[in-house]
Amino acid sequence: MKIGQLIKERYEIVELLGEGGMAFVYKAKDMQLERMVAIKTLKPNYVEQTTFVERFKREAQTAANLNHPNIVQIFDWGIEEEPYFVMEYIEGNTLTSIISNRKTISLSDVLFIGAQVANGLQAAHSQGLVHRDIKPGNIMITPSGKVKVTDFGIVSIQDEESDITKTGSILGTASYISPEQAQGKAVSVGSDLYSLGTVLYELITGSPPFEADTPIATATKHLTEKPEKPSKYRQDLPRGIENAILKLLHKTPRDRFKSAEDLRAVLLQQRNQLEMVQTQESLVDLTNPKIKYKFTLPALIVSIGLVLGTFWTLSLSLIHI
């Protein structure tokens, strides 16, 4: 696709937003509804490969059926020079970009992001869908703080395995892949929760739980090694938050949270507790005599000055009378 090109006599390509392994994403204008949209199109070298075309079409169909505030909405699908689909245009950044641009993300923000991702995943899981590629690059944050899960291209439909998602296929991203995915085993709700656990781990510590020189070596670590406790890198981390993350990173799916909704509830509970502690500490500061003196002394001096100034002005006025 080219800048200025008109798709379906409706969508005008404005600019290239980015590209992934198999697709380009463009910003476009919907001429009928007078709004900006994003258009994802398959790269030309994949157009002749049936597996990738089916996977691309599958993403459009799957996401189109998920009408949820924490999932990017799909509006349209078609084939021009290449297959494409039209989706909601998000003003914001991926978590990958946010992580690279900020040294530390507040624990409250981490928990809020995690709760919103879990909310979106619950919507997918309730329809028998497993995302299979939860990672920072597939999570977007809007300027208002709303989280959007993207890229359902390798989604697995429970009880309906196709040739492109069947057991034995290793799909996912090495740093965030679940142990069962790394082995090519069947995926479940727990697989997405594990991947979300790796994302939360990275948001808190600055790095994924497992890293190595090659994707295969990284995936192997998910199978064979225990993650370091995140509190080793973030000493202010409350135990409840750490326990939740380590539970997500259990090697066996049954030892993780039972559902994304259960996880969401725990993350919000931990966030409320964290904010209560911060509020309590703030109230303690208000009762600290030293802090009180520090702020009230200048105010007292200013007040005395105003009184003396008023008195002096009044005195001069009386003299003139």
What is the predicted function of each stretch?
Residues 14-20, 25:
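Protein kinase glycine-rich loop
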Residues 43-65:
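AlphaC helix of the eukaryotic protein kinase fold
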Residues 50, 143-186:
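Activation segment of protein kinases
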Residues 77:
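Activation-segment/catalytic-loop signature of the eukaryotic protein kinase fold
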Residues 80-94, 98:
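Conserved short submotifs of the Hanks-type protein kinase catalytic core
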Residues 113-114:
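Activation segment signature within eukaryotic-like protein kinase domains
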Residues 119-129:
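Protein kinase catalytic-loop region centered on the HRD/HxD motif
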Residues 131, 173-274:
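C-terminal lobe helix-coil module of Hanks-type protein kinase domains
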